[in-house]
Amino acid sequence: AYTAQVRSGYGFSSPALPVGTYLDTLSGGEPAPVKGLSIGIPLGLLNRHALVAGATGTGKTRTLQLLAEGLSAAGVPVFLADVKGDLTGLAEAGASNDKIASRIASTGQDWKGQSFPIELFNLGGSDSGAGISGTPIRTTVTEFGPILLSRVLGLNDTQASALQLVFHWADSQGLALLDLKDLRAVVDYLTNTEAGKEELKTIGGVSAATAGVILREIAALEAAGGEAFFGEPALDVRDLMRVSPDGRGIISALELADIQSQGTLFSTFLM
């Protein structure tokens, strides 16, 4: 009776991502797969939040890998953070062995090793710490904007307002702020030159103390890796939403194996 309930509960009419098989443990014998009864998640529900939890070695990373593989096979692009540096194995087809064969037999699943289309990214060209290179993820200061940048720099309301004035002036002059050097140069011009001070008066002044704080925080962000993160070419989110020629979703993996030394840079990226 319970098996029938499970079969009814997982009888989706819409496409679903398979995650396993149902093992019958109620008959009193050894757990055995029920023929024709697979467990899956409807693709339409996979944009919701989920938590994969478990003790060390219970398969959390492997579960995420299987989800990424299933989505890719269904033609859905995937973006994931590879904190431990072990998800790059998606690019290579797995080889069978006795342990895998035994597991397949016990769960009643069909399995064949296959590779998946994967592209590796890192933050601003930083070293992943695992000898893995990838395409740098960057953005320009202009696209990042003064509000988010103020948060990253830890500015108070007065300092944040001053930074917005700097962005406004640069925009009115048609100046693209590509990296932190550009921003520092504009702040320095507006606050430390007579010509710049005169122009700044037309939109509101910035005190020398406020400018000094902004410049110091910019220098600190540069030292923490921001110099590599801000620049061109800027990330286009559409690059993460692509499919391969065979119709499978491309898996974009952000390599973060060295995240412990990239805390400021990673928090900036999350903004």
Positions of predicted regions on the chain:
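P-loop NTPase motor domains
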Residues: E69-G70, G75-P77, G85-M271
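Alpha-helix N-cap/helix-initiation motif
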Residues: A53-L64, I259-S267
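Residues that cap or initiate secondary-structure elements
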Residues: L45-N47, T58, S126-D127, Q260
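Basic- and hydrophobic-enriched, low-structure N-terminal and domain-boundary segments
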Residues: A1-A55, R62-A74, V78-F79, K84-S106, ...
